[in-house]
Amino acid sequence: MPCPLSNYKILMNTPAQHAKFVKLTTEPVGRLVTGLAVPAMVSMLVTGIYNLVDTFFVGQINTQSVAALGIVFSYMSIVQSIAFFFGQGAGNYISRMLGHEDSHNAGIMASVGLVSTWLTGAVIAVIGFLFMEPVLLFFGSTATILPYACDYFTFILLGTPFIMSCFTMNNLMRHQGNAVLSMLGIMTGAALNVILDPIFIFGLGLGVKGAGMATALSQMVSFTLMLMLAGKRGGVPISLAKFKPSRQRYRDIAAGGLPSLARQSMMGIAALILNHVAGLYGDSAIASFSVVSRITMLASAAMIGYGQGFQPVCGFNYGAGKFDRVRAAFIHSCKVSTIYCTILAVAGFIFARQLVSLFVESDPEVSRIGAEVLRYQCLSFPLTGYVVMVNMYLQNIRRTVPAVIIAMARQGIFLIPALFLGNWLLGFLGVEIAQAVADTASFLLAIPLGINTLNRMGKE
C-alpha cells in the first residue's frame, strides 16, 4: 500500500527526529499511546483543576462572581476554538510530515500556525475592548452579573493573544510526540495561576478582577516557556523567519483544524444559549451550570488527554502508511476511554451534591440545582469516550466532513435543539437533561461514521 503522502519530497531529519519516527511507527501501540497520553492527561487534569480552583476562590466572593465566570466561558470557548483550529490543523499536518520524515515543511507549518494564532488573538482582543458590554450581554449576562463580568473580562482580553497561543503551542508540541515538554509549560502556568489567585483576589482585595489578572499573567508565562521548549527533544523549532504563509498552507490547516473549530465554537455557542435559557430561572441557575461545566471539564480532561496521546500515533503511522497500527491504536484508545468515563460517571452520580457544594457551599440553591444537573450528565458520560476518539481519529486522517459533523453534534447539532425543546416541553427539567440527550444522540451518530471509515482505511 503506498504511503498517503508519497507525493511529498523527503527532507533530511536530525537524528533525534528520526529516532522519534522509528519509535512512533514500531513500538507496540498500547504502550506507545499510554506513554504519550500520560503527560497529555496530566496537562489536561492540571488545566481542569486550575479551572476548579479558580471557581473555588471566586465562589468565596458571591454568586454573581461565579456566574460571571460562566458568562466569560462562552468567550473563552470561542477563542479556544480558533486556537485549536490553528493548533490542530497545523499539528495534524506536522505529524503526517514527520511520519514522512519531512521536518522542513513541518517547521514552516508550526511557525505559520503559531504566528497566525497570536495575530488573530490580538485582533479579537481589540474588538472585545471596543464592544465589551454588548458582547457580555450577548453571552447571557444579566444586569446584576454585568459589573463582575466586565471586571473579569478586562484582563482576559489583555491575555487573549497569549491564552490562544498557549492552546496552539500545546497542540503543536503534542502532535510531534513532545507531550512531556508541553505538560511542563501547561503545569507551570496552572501552578502560577493557583498561587496568584488568592493573592490577587483576597490579599490585594481585587475580587473577580484579580482572578482575571492571575489568568492573564500565568498564560503569558506558560506561552513563553513553551516557546523556549519548542525545538527540544527532536521538536521542530519555531521562528518568525519560518513564517511563510500561503494559501495552500492555510488550506492544509483548515483541513485538519475545521473539526476543532466546529467543536469548540459549538461549545461556546451552546454555553451562550445555555446562559440565556438558564437565565430565565435566575442567577442561581446560571451559577449552577457554571460550576457543573467545570466539574465535567475536569472529568473529561484525562479522557481527552488519552485521546491526545493517540493523535500523534495515528498521524505518524497514517503518514507512514501503517494502517493496521492506526486501527489497533484507535480500538485500544476507545476501550480505555470508555472504562475511564464509566468509573467517573458512577462516582459523580453518587457524590454529586458533595462535589457541587465544594464550590458554592454558601448558596444551598446553587448546590441543589447543580447536583441535579451533574447527575443527569453522569448518565450519558460513559458514551462520550467513543465519540471523542472517533472525532480525533477522523480529524487526524483528514476525513474533514465526517469529523466536522461529529465535532458539531454533541455541542451543536443535538444540544442546542435539546435546550430549546427541553425548556419548551419540560421547563427547567428539560434544560437539565439536554446534555444527556445530546450525548446519547451523538454516540448513535458516531457508531456508523467511525466503523465505516475504519473499515475503508487503506482500501481507497
Predicted regions and their residues:
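Helix-terminus/linker motif at the lipid-water interface of multi-pass membrane proteins
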Residues: 45, 49-67, 136-143, 199-206, ...
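Transmembrane helical elements of multi-pass membrane transporters/channels
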Residues: 35-54, 155, 189, 218-222, ...
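N-terminal transmembrane alpha-helices
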Residues: 24-56, 60-61, 77-89, 93, ...
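Small-residue-rich hydrophobic transmembrane alpha-helices
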Residues: 66-126, 163-182, 288-352, 384-406
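Hydrophobic transmembrane alpha-helices of multi-pass small-molecule transporters
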Residues: 78-81, 193-198, 222-227, 298-301, ...
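Short alpha-helical transmembrane segments in multi-pass integral membrane proteins
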Residues: 2-37, 94-161, 203-258, 314-380, ...
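Small-residue hotspots at the loop-to-helix junctions and early N-terminal turns
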Residues: 63-74, 149-153, 212, 283-294, ...
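Short runs within selected transmembrane alpha-helices of multi-pass transporters and secretion channels
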Residues: 87, 156-174, 182-190, 211-224, ...
